[in-house]
Every structure is written in structure tokens, then in C-alpha cells.
Amino acid sequence: EQCGRQAGGATCPNNLCCSQYGY
């Protein structure tokens, strides 16, 4: 997945689900 736990719970400014890279 590109979001959630693998992304460290990161989210984009658009309130979208982002990857661990921040996009």
C-alpha cells in the first residue's frame, strides 16, 4: 500500500492518502 501503516500514517495536504515519501 502507498498509505496507512506503510506510509507511517502520512497524508497529503489535500487530505489524501500519501506514501512514505510524502506524495
Curated annotation (Swiss-Prot):
Its EC number is 3.2.1.14. Gene3D superfamilies: Endochitinase-like. One of its GO terms (molecular function) is chitin binding. It catalyses: Random endo-hydrolysis of N-acetyl-beta-D-glucosaminide (1->4)-beta-linkages in chitin and chitodextrins. SUPFAM superfamilies: Plant lectins/antimicrobial peptides. InterPro entries: Chitin-bd_1 (IPR001002), Endochitinase-like_sf (IPR036861). The keyword NAD does not apply. This is Endochitinase B. Keywords: Carbohydrate metabolism, Chitin degradation, Chitin-binding, Glycosidase, Hydrolase, Plant defense, Polysaccharide degradation. Induction: By infection with the fungal pathogen Ascochyta pisi. Belongs to the glycosyl hydrolase 19 family. Chitinase class I subfamily. Defense against chitin-containing fungal pathogens. GO terms for biological process: chitin catabolic process; defense response; polysaccharide catabolic process. It comes from the Eukaryota. The keyword Membrane does not apply. It is an enzyme of class 3 (hydrolase).
